Amino acid sequence: MLVKEIKLLRNIIKDWRKHGYSIGLVTTMGFLHEGHQSLIKKAVKENDKVVVSVFVNPTQFGPNEDFNSYPRDIDKDFKYCMDSGATVVFNPSPEEMYLKGNCTTINVSGLTDFLCGAKRPVHFGGVCLVVSKFLNIVTPDKAYFGEKDAQQLAVIKRMVKDLNIDTEIIGCPIIRENDGLAKSSRNTYLSEEERKSALILNKSLSLAKEELVKGNLNPENIKELITAKINSEHLAKIDYVEIVDSETLQPVKQIEHSILVAIAVFIGKTRLIDNFTFELNI
């Protein structure tokens, strides 16, 4: 079922609650791929009803970013969601989601000071606002987010905790192409040559992981190795290479417990992100 109005969706949710159904939510910006499908299928497995939102959120894009060019295909997305087991696809307009004169913002300080938050200053304010709206409208028991957007996942978990929102936030593993490239809607921007060059993200992270497993626990040294590997690809331009505490997302000077190794790289004009977590077993 395709729903575009908040009021109608809320009426559907009320009816589900009357019957005691559990509800799962997957929020997306559309142009769905196997990464999204893995979230939907997990939600379907764990809940009686599943809502998938398909909404390119204008408030999380900064000036000169790709809001207008972001790929959209609601007909294809709707079929993809239904084939994956979703109950409802919620596809509101920006006017439906944001009242004229909207002046409410949500800022999760600290967690957004580094990584993508530092490079895209308006991004997480927009993410938090729209996700809080979806959680308020759908009131899901569980909501599912991909670990590829590791900072987003951490920020949303913190927001939900701080605002006492009664939804369990569940992180789901990164889904990759056979050659290791993390699935992303933005991969469609890549030319054939750029697509090959994009493999440098996973290659550089694999190198870092090997070094960590060997016992190289110097974060600056690991960052240097990643940087050198990425710079060996002429189409790649580094946005950031960071090693941070996996919970606080603060940069670490030494590796003592769980860390997140995260990178953002421009391949041509396309900005791609990737990461992995590493747990030090003492």
UniProtKB/Swiss-Prot annotation:
Q: At which positions is (R)-pantoate bound? A: Q60, Q152
Q: Give the UniProt subcellular location, in the record's own words.
A: Cytoplasm
Q: List, alphabetically, the InterPro entries matched.
A: Cyt_trans-like, Pantoate_ligase, Pantoate_ligase_C, Rossmann-like_a/b/a_fold
Positions of beta-alanine binding = Q60
- Pathway(s) served: Cofactor biosynthesis; (R)-pantothenate biosynthesis; (R)-pantothenate from (R)-pantoate and beta-alanine: step 1/1
Q: Which residues does ATP bind? A: 29-36, 146-149, 175, 183-186
Does ATP-binding count among this protein's keywords?
yes
Chief place where the protein resides: cytoplasm
Q: Which SUPFAM superfamilies match?
A: Nucleotidylyl transferase (SSF52374)
Per the UniProt entry, the disulfide pairs are: none
Q: Does the keyword Membrane apply?
A: no
The cellular component terms of Gene Ontology attached to this UniProt record, alphabetical and capped at eight, are: cytosol
This one is known as: Pantothenate synthetase
The protein's job, in short, is: Catalyzes the condensation of pantoate with beta-alanine in an ATP-dependent reaction via a pantoyl-adenylate intermediate.
EC number, as in UniProt: 6.3.2.1
| Gene3D superfamilies registered for this protein in UniProt | HUPs, Pantoate-beta-alanine ligase, C-terminal domain
Biological process per Gene Ontology, one example term: pantothenate biosynthetic process
Q: Which family does it belong to?
A: Belongs to the pantothenate synthetase family.
Q: Which reaction does it catalyse?
A: (R)-pantoate + beta-alanine + ATP = (R)-pantothenate + AMP + diphosphate + H(+)
Q: Which UniProt keywords apply?
A: ATP-binding, Cytoplasm, Ligase, Nucleotide-binding, Pantothenate biosynthesis
Q: Whom does it interact with, and what assembly results?
A: Homodimer.
Q: Which domain of life is it from?
A: Bacteria
- Which terms in the Gene Ontology molecular function aspect does this entry carry? ATP binding; pantoate-beta-alanine ligase activity
Catalytic residue list: H36 (proton donor)
Q: What else is known?
A: The reaction proceeds by a bi uni uni bi ping pong mechanism.
